[in-house]
Amino acid sequence: MTGLDKTNDALIEVAVLVTDGDLEILGEGVDVVIKPPAGALESMDDFVRNMHTTSGLLEELDGGITLAEAEEACLAYVKEHCPEPGKAPLAGNSVGTDRAFIERDLPTFAEFMSYRTIDVSSLKELAKRWFPRVFFNTPEKHGGHRALADIRESIQELKYYREVLFVKEPGPTSDEARAASKKFEITPQ
């Protein structure tokens, strides 16, 4: 993105990876650069311009594809691994902004995806509050703010949280889970 403003900024790179229930990546994924509309780069602030210059993304924009081509590639890949509409959640770090741009620029893809979101950043925030040792040992990121690298790092981070934050297999018995649930149930008044 040329920034985080859904009204004024442009989507300039899209990457998609589908995983199975064990967070293993299925297929090759999608990683495309989108040619921005005329004038889209002029409003980019210095921080974003420097980030995209350092990552090499700005150099690639002239060879980018259209939003329609990007949407077609994303849909084809997701449908290959999750053919039923509304079943594939959007996942990653701070994906609320991503979803806003996807809904604006890739509406057919947005409609195909589930309304549900798996935001790895939420787990990070919970770890910071409840398990600081987990938070302070989160895997380092080296993706340089490129879409595909960011997704791969989000998957690895989610695997880390699964290993260190969640109850180990087989988890509680059904009776134990019901008993715990009862402790937190709010009864109607």
Residue positions per predicted region:
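Short conserved catalytic/interaction loops centered on acidic-Pro-aromatic/His motifs
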Residues: 110-114, 134-138, 167-173
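Conserved beta-strand scaffold positions in the cores of enzyme catalytic domains, especially
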Residues: 90, 117-120
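Short, well-ordered beta-to-alpha junction loops that form the rim of enzyme active sites
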Residues: 91-96
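Active-site-proximal helix-loop-helix substrate-binding element of RNase H-like nuclease domains
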Residues: 36-39, 46-48, 120-155
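Acidic two-metal-ion nuclease catalytic site recognized across multiple nuclease folds
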Residues: 141, 145-189
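Substrate-recognition/cap helix-loop segment adjacent to the acidic, metal-dependent catalytic center
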Residues: 80-82, 97-116
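Conserved non-catalytic scaffold segment of RNase H-like nuclease domains
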Residues: 1-90, 139, 185-189
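Acidic active-site catalytic centers that drive phospho-/nucleotidyl reactions
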Residues: 13, 20, 98, 119, ...
